[in-house]
Each structure stands twice: as C-alpha cells, then as structure tokens.
Amino acid sequence: MEFLTDPWQWWVEPFTGDPLLQRAVLAGLLTVLVTSVVGTWVVLRGTTYLGEALGHGILPGVAAAYLLGGNPTAGALVAAAAMAVGVRGIQRRSPLPGESAIGLLLVGMLALTVVLVAAADEIDEHDLQEMLFGSLLRTSPADLLRQAALVGVAILVALVFHHALLVLTFDEVQARLMGMRPRLTELAFLLLVALSVTASFNAVGSLLVFAFLVAPPAAAAMLVRRVPAMMATSALIGTGSVLLGALLAHHLLGTPGHIHGGPSTGAGHTSPEEVAMPATMALVAVAVVLVVMVVRGVRNDSES
C-alpha cells in the first residue's frame, strides 16, 4: 500500500531521478501524440486492420536495415511507405475484398521478414526482440530527436489533410461534389498511418504499436463526438496509460538502473523487464477501453 502511505515516493520520485525512465516516458508520450491523432482517423474510418497490417509490414524494412548495416528507422520508413502504396494498389485493382487483399500483402511481408532474419547472421535475439517489442528503456537523446522529427512530419500531414479526411470519412459523395480528390486523400491517410507506425516502433515495437494506435482512440470515441475532442481525449488516455504503465513496470519488475547496470544483464541482451514496460503501458490502455465499455453498457441499460 505504499502508493497510499507514501504517494510522493511511489508516484513522483521514479520520474525525477532516473534519466533512463525519463527518456522512456518521453518516447512513450511522443508515441501517444502521433497515435492519438492518426488513430482517431483509423477508428472513425473502421480501418483498424490496416493499422495492424502496417504495424507488422515494417518488419522487412527493419530486418533489411540490420542486414545491410543501415538505420532501422530508415528501413522501417521505406517498408511502411511501400506497404502503404501496395495496400492502395491492391485495394484499387484486386478483385478480392479489401481486408483479404491487405491480409495477403501482410502475409507476404511477414514471410519476407522470416527469410531475411534466417539469412542474416547479423540479426541476433536482441535485435529480433527490439523489432517486435521496441527498446523503450534504451531510448537515447538521438532516438528522441528522430522520433520527434517523424512525429512532427506526421502531425503536419494530418493538419494539411484534416478537412479532406473529415469530409471523406463522413460523406464521400459530398467530398466529390466539393471537388476534393478522394484518391489523393486515401493515399495521404495510408502514408499518415505509415509515418505514425514508423515514429512509434522504435519505442514500443511493431507488435504493440497497434495497441496505441487503436485503444486510446477507441475509448475516446465512446466518450466524445467531435473529432478534435476525440484526439484530445485519446491523448489524455494515452498519457495516463504511459505514466501508469511505466510506474507499474518500475515498481513491480525493477528499476531501469537495475535492468541496465545489473550483473545479470549482458551486452546485447534484452531483459524481460525491458520488454514488459511498453507492454504494461499498452495493457493499461486496453484496460481503459474495457472499463469505458462496461460503464457505458451499464449506463445504457439503466436508461433503457
């Protein structure tokens, strides 16, 4: 019960004295910022499967970057852009239903990832864990700068296409009558999702970025109606999830200093505690969605 008997030490002190945890939280908050904006459109447009596909579709680019000795973020960006263009092309030309076509492309990208990983001696267990689960507790100042730059570009694109996305999402016929270009807006939306995934994967990994892209916006969509309010509410929920998730992982699983400096943690090895921190953040976000669903269901039952 230390969180009640000594609230300062439990709730605040972990964030004041450990630069590793501070950078981890900043990376998490940058992830929340971009996924709250982009994820709102993902939820409103009913394209959550697309977000999942793009989240996993970056893996071949990351694997290729490790294989060639390049920058994983650059590899992820190239793969995400290729995946976005590929999804758009398949949606336009394939006779298959939209989700089936996206699933086919996703399977191909995952298979390519397996081939690259199997063929590359340069990719070890540590690299594979970082690809899947991120490296939140190993975030460096340079990582934060790269992430902030990608987040800034994504937010700028979202601002430029905000009106077009708003009209196209709720009334495609009206968008055409207004002289808008739905194809260009659709491509911009795909690239926007690709940018948000690329900006977030280094922190939370390709498997968990989907949770941040969907969970806070989904909870916000059940609480408010207007798009800007949804984005703001999603950001608040995501921020709370990052902070509470970091605290839970810190108190229950160990401190970042122990993780990085302890004798049991060798170079190139990702400890379970490191993997667990972004997962704990995502788990809190999903828990918020479930709580909102239950509360809303109870309220609707009482009013009916």
Language model segments and positions:
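Peri-membrane helix termini and adjoining interfacial loops of integral membrane proteins
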Residues: 1-9, 120-132, 211, 260-267
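Membrane-interfacial amphipathic/re-entrant helices at transmembrane-helix boundaries
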Residues: 1-31
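Helix-loop-helix "hairpin" substructures at the membrane interface of multi-pass membrane proteins
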Residues: 25-27, 31, 143-216
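Hydrophobic alpha-helical transmembrane segments
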Residues: 25-30, 73-78, 100-104, 144-149, ...
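Hydrophobic alpha-helical segments embedded in the membrane of multi-pass proteins
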Residues: 33, 55-59, 81, 107-108, ...
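Short loop segments and helix-boundary regions at transmembrane helix junctions
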Residues: 40-123, 220-234, 247-256, 294-301
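Loop-to-transmembrane alpha-helix initiation sites
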Residues: 72-78, 99-103, 148, 208-209, ...
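Mid-bilayer segments of alpha-helical transmembrane spans in multi-pass integral membrane proteins
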Residues: 85, 89, 104-123, 135-147, ...
